[in-house]
Amino acid sequence: MLASGENVNILVLDTEVYSNTGGQSSKSTPAGAIAKFAASGKKIRKKDLGMMAMSYGYVYVAQVAMGANPVQYLNAIKEAEAYDGPSLIIAYAPCINHGLKAGMGLSQKEEKLAVECGYWHLYRFNPELEGTDKNPFSLDSKEPDWSKFQDFLKGEVRFASLYKLFPERADELLQRTEEFAKIRLESYKKLAGK
């Protein structure tokens, strides 16, 4: 759909698993997460759908988390609607398969924690800004507090279960998850000129 160049707006609720069919591992599942077909924790990083869409060069792309920054979320929706071409908004969406220890009633708080610790990054890419004095890529997240990253992961059963099921590999896999988040952030900083 994005490759068509049509003026269409797409909202992806990124649960990081195939939620509608029972929580199977997907290309969007992060390293270290336990899901069906990744019972010992996924070993490779998740695909970066936003970067893939930006590679077209003519797709508006935003990554959002409403619980973390409602203003950025609304700005992304307004910009996507105003953009004359395909737009993609990727929204972090905690789901039952994450096993939030705090409970699903606090999913907005979970989104905020995800951004604060660096697990999820907020940005907007507007191709209309190319050729102007403004950078088309805006990194909207603040610098993460990496000291909270591992606690964030341990607050979700999909990651914390590694310590019960595979204690000898848990630290390594969850550290890998943090390393992949840092790599993603560095690539976003380069795009933002930081």
Per-range role (PLM):
Residues 2-8, 13-143, 149:
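Glycine-rich ThDP/TPP pyrophosphate-binding loop and its adjacent helix/strand module
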Residues 20, 76-80, 104, 136, ...:
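Metallocofactor- and cofactor-centric catalytic cores in central/energy metabolism, strongly enriched
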